[in-house]
């Protein structure tokens, strides 16, 4: 007869779970990746380590509602709130992608209480690299 396994937890015995420590980072960088389907906001320290992040899907939107400017606004506010718990007061913004939530996310970072320094567009431009997807015919 097969022995019945006892239900275990996600953390195994003897394995340490990583405790999230509060960092004190006054100046950081906000990376906003806005695609046609989603918007992801990551706030990092000057070395590039992620302090806080949020996305339209993480905030609770599904499907085509993730690509709306309102979803990007809520994601940016959520990420800014988490970053302020770590002491972030000023951010430089790096925006990437062609999505609709770019400007809204920057505005909501300011409205959430973060001081925005520089705004840079770091959208990758191909030097005739991969073939783009075919045109939509609706």
From Swiss-Prot:
Q: Where is the composition biased (Low complexity)?
A: 1-12
Task: Report biased composition (Basic residues) as residue ranges.
Answer: 13-22
Q: Name one GO biological process term.
A: translation
State a GO cellular component annotated for this protein: ribosome
Q: Does the keyword Isomerase apply?
A: no
Q: Name one GO molecular function term.
A: rRNA binding
* Keywords assigned: Ribonucleoprotein, Ribosomal protein, RNA-binding, rRNA-binding
The signal peptide, as residue positions, is none
- Asked if the Swiss-Prot or TrEMBL record annotates the protein with the keyword Ribosomal protein, the reply is yes
Which Pfam families does the UniProt record give? Ribosomal_S11 (PF00411)
Q: Where is this region: Disordered?
A: 1-32, 119-138
| HAMAP family assigned to the protein according to its UniProt record, in alphabetical order | Ribosomal_uS11
Q: In which family does this protein belong, per the annotation?
A: Belongs to the universal ribosomal protein uS11 family.
Functionally, this protein is described as follows: Located on the platform of the 30S subunit, it bridges several disparate RNA helices of the 16S rRNA. Forms part of the Shine-Dalgarno cleft in the 70S ribosome.
How does this chain assemble? Part of the 30S ribosomal subunit. Interacts with proteins S7 and S18. Binds to IF-3.
Name assigned to this protein: Small ribosomal subunit protein uS11
- The species this protein belongs to is Mycolicibacterium smegmatis (strain ATCC 700084 / mc(2)155) (Mycobacterium smegmatis)
What taxonomic ancestry is recorded?
Answer: Bacteria, Bacillati, Actinomycetota, Actinomycetes, Mycobacteriales
């Amino acid at each position: 007869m097969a022995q019945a396994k006892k239900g275990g937890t996600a953390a195994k015995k003897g394995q340490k779970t990583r405790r999230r420590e509060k960092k004190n980072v006054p100046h950081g960088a906000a990376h906003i990746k806005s695609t046609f389907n989603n918007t992801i906001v990551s706030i990092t320290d000057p070395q590039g380590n992620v302090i806080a992040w949020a996305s339209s899907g993480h905030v609770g939107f599904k499907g085509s509602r993730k690509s709306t400017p309102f979803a990007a606004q809520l994601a940016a506010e959520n990420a800014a709130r988490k970053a302020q718990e770590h002491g972030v007061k000023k951010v430089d913004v790096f925006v990437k992608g062609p999505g609709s939530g770019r400007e809204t996310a920057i505005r909501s970072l300011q409205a959430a209480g973060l001081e925005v320094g520089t705004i840079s567009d770091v959208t990758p431009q191909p030097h005739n690299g991969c073939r783009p997807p075919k045109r939509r015919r609706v």
